[in-house]
Regions:
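A glycine- and small-aliphatic-rich helix-loop capping segment at beta-alpha/alpha-beta transitions
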Residues: 21-28, 112-126, 176-179, 199-212, ...
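Acyl-CoA/ACP chain-elongation machinery
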Residues: 181-226, 259-273, 303-310, 327-377
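Glycine-/small-residue-rich "gating" segment that lines the acyl/pantetheine channel
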Residues: 123-130, 171, 175, 191-247, ...
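Conserved beta-ketoacyl condensing-enzyme motif
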Residues: 7, 23-24, 28-161, 190-199, ...
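Condensing-enzyme catalytic core mediating Claisen C-C bond formation in acyl metabolism
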Residues: 4-8, 35, 213-289, 298
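Phosphate/pyrophosphate-binding loops at sites that engage ATP/ADP/AMP, CoA/4′-phosphopantetheine
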Residues: 84-96, 245-250, 282-298, 320-324
Length: 409
């Protein structure tokens, strides 16, 4: 028999708050976390704005020496996982370590280390790179460091699917628990790629917004949208088998009841114009959850503020939800957080969970004039109080990746 899977812990480090409570408070205020780049000298870059984590202080969880050896993407991941672990009130005796998994991923991994060590290799010779280079660069060491820290000896399986990576990782952790292989799992993602190489790589693809006004930079579904704003951060959820959570007296935030994943098999960066893969992904999640389209109250959209994504994602929502697409609330929180790439799905899943708890939909803050083909209720400007019993989070990624999760109050 399939097991029930619930969320018992949340952790986040984001451009609008370095813990879950602060992030949510700022989300409800419509705080814009986008600003001028400070993590590197962007004076010669075509792109000068990003959504950075501010006043990063890892000292609550990591001593200065340890943090100094780790790539920023790993530090962010450890911080979010630590908050989630504490929030869930887990302890070494609370779970069988071999039934405790880690599904914490990244879209790109340790790009800060890749960039800095490549500069060292060019300037001083390849044999002068740091001995920590490889372990800081590879994606599985985000989750690997978390599993070592908390003695989670079950599978460490980061699903790497670009900007849907953490959504897929949460979905696969869900399946492992639902099918009886695990009792508890860290699930989510971390990203920190705001450096000269990361910004340039996306900029030359014309994927990034290149203006210099943070208030008008990330404008999902807006007529004037022109590209995404790179963000950084981490989000981790504790997924737990329901009976296991009840037995230890854990508080339960919400239940995860559906997961869908597809590939467009169409193009390396562009979504399929027909929205077939996007819509099928949501349909699979609904089937998995045993819900009708009319059951969904809120969709946290991928909503990147790129011309293609927002138009095609809107089409996909209409194809699945029909007339109900105009009755439910949709929003993109990327106007506040920027696009956190492989971490975005985890942070947006946390937003869905908090929406269920608080019965409120977070806003799309920067959008003022909707594009004609984007005509849904995108919750513009301010949060909306409404009944939210089922929330769907969808994320898309380069390579035609599509992933959707459904959470139940």
């Amino acid at each position: 028999m399939k097991k029930r899977v619930v969320i018992t812990g949340l952790g986040a480090v984001t451009p609008i708050g370095n813990n879950v409570q602060t992030m949510w408070e700022n989300m409800m205020k419509g705080t814009n976390g986008i600003g001028m780049i400070s993590l590197f000298d962007a004076s010669q870059s075509k792109v000068k704005i990003a959504a950075e984590v501010k006043q990063l202080d890892a000292s609550k969880y990591l001593d200065e020496r340890t943090a100094g050896k780790l790539d920023r993407v790993i530090v962010l991941g450890i911080m979010a996982a630590s908050e989630a672990y504490e929030d869930a009130k887990l302890s070494p005796n609370a779970v069988d370590p071999y039934r405790f998994g880690t599904f914490v991923t990244s879209g790109i991994g340790g790009l800060n280390s890749i960039w800095s060590e490549s500069q060292t290799a060019v300037a001083r010779g390849a044999d002068r790179v740091s001995p920590h280079f490889i372990t800081n660069a590879i994606i599985n060491l985000v989750g690997g460091n978390i599993s070592m820290r908390f003695k989670a000896k079950g599978p460490n399986l980061p699903v790497v699917t670009a900007c849907s990576a953490s959504t897929n990782s949460i979905g696969e952790a869900f399946r492992y628990i639902r099918d009886g292989y695990l009792d508890v799992a860290f699930a989510g993602g971390s990203e920190s790629s705001i450096n000269a190489l990361g910004i340039a790589g996306f900029a030359v693809m014309r994927a990034l917004h290149s203006g210099d006004n943070p208030a008008k930079a990330s404008m999902p579904f807006d007529k004037k949208r022109s590209g995404f704003v790179m963000g950084e951060g981490a989000g981790v959820l504790i997924l737990e088998e329901y009976e296991h959570a009840v037995a230890r007296g854990a508080k339960i935030y919400a239940e995860l009841i559906g997961y869908g994943s597809t590939s467009d098999a169409f193009h390396v960066t562009a979504p399929d114009e027909t929205a077939e893969g996007i819509s099928k992904c949501m349909e699979l999640a609904l089937q998995d959850a045993k819900l009708k389209p009319t059951d969904i109250d809120y969709i946290n959209a991928h909503g990147t503020s790129t011309p293609l994504n927002d138009r095609i994602e809107t089409l996909g929502i209409k194809k699945v939800f029909g007339p109900h697409a105009y009755q439910l609330n949709v929003s993109s929180t990327k106007g506040m957080t920027g696009h956190m790439l492989g971490a975005t799905g985890a942070v947006e899943s946390i937003a869905c969970v908090l929406s269920l708890i608080n019965q409120v939909v977070p806003p799309t803050i920067t959008t003022t004039e909707l594009s004609p083909e984007c005509d849904l209720n995108y919750t513009l400007g301010t949060p909306v109080k409404r009944p939210v019993n089922y929330a769907l989070n969808i994320n898309l990624g380069f390579g035609g990746q599509n992933a959707a999760l459904i959470f139940k109050r």
